[in-house]
């Protein structure tokens, strides 16, 4: 398995393309100059394209991925109804979902043969919309509205329209600020990092019809932490055993172990990391974690070790200015 790591640096308007080897070392293979401030990125389900959101001219760009070395070639673009904060796709590669924090909306862009061809639906009134996350069964779109302390739930129709479910939302505690999410591989649990109180909620998916319950909330910060809480990103290993979340004020990654059924998180430790880590990701082998420092302009690679999933630094690399997004593609 070959793996390519993509790093989006909006301040220098670049994507750095790296080869990740089996020992956790990175080799720079390409630097792509992007026509705009590049932020969120996602790889298409068939691994043929990288979709990126850019500003200040709000667009989704599609880059063709070379199957041998992961190099990028521009392929297409499509306008968006708001500044892109988060980007994702459905599991069949039919639609791109874009959440916009500033516009307070989520949009659906249709794909034809992997290329974006236009927006087919927009839902407004999602104050502080920070991500759009398709459920494992490809039926439900989870959309955290950070400023409203709620996660809105939509059914995705065959033509890409979003239909509010019943119930149409679940709520967090007041002032939590739900932001980014991941799903357990067993498809029974979801985990949401809350930006404003730096906590992680565990949501049980009781059935595919919106019957969802928060079964655990964990503070992700050290006991003596008294500064402003400012959580950012969350990721889980492919085997579902280890979960990670980061806080930008403390510049640390919190390490959680996950119970076998996915229902319980246990805090295992903290890893100091790059300054203001807004984005990170876990590789497809579950052996390495790559974190980007928005203020350090570097990335660090960590090996995931032991039953606790603690992080051991393997290497550090300069990237573009203000790196914000990390994506790993296996090919």
Swiss-Prot record:
Its EC number is 3.1.1.31. The modification N6-acetyllysine is found at residue 287. One of its GO terms (molecular function) is 6-phosphogluconolactonase activity. Pathway: Carbohydrate degradation; pentose phosphate pathway; D-ribulose 5-phosphate from D-glucose 6-phosphate (oxidative stage): step 2/3. GO terms for biological process: glucose metabolic process; pentose-phosphate shunt, oxidative branch. Keywords: Acetylation, Carbohydrate metabolism, Glucose metabolism, Hydrolase. It comes from the Bacteria. One of its GO terms (cellular component) is cytosol. Pfam families: Lactonase. Belongs to the cycloisomerase 2 family. NCBIfam families: PRK11028.1. This is 6-phosphogluconolactonase. It comes from Escherichia coli O6:H1 (strain CFT073 / ATCC 700928 / UPEC). The gene is pgl.
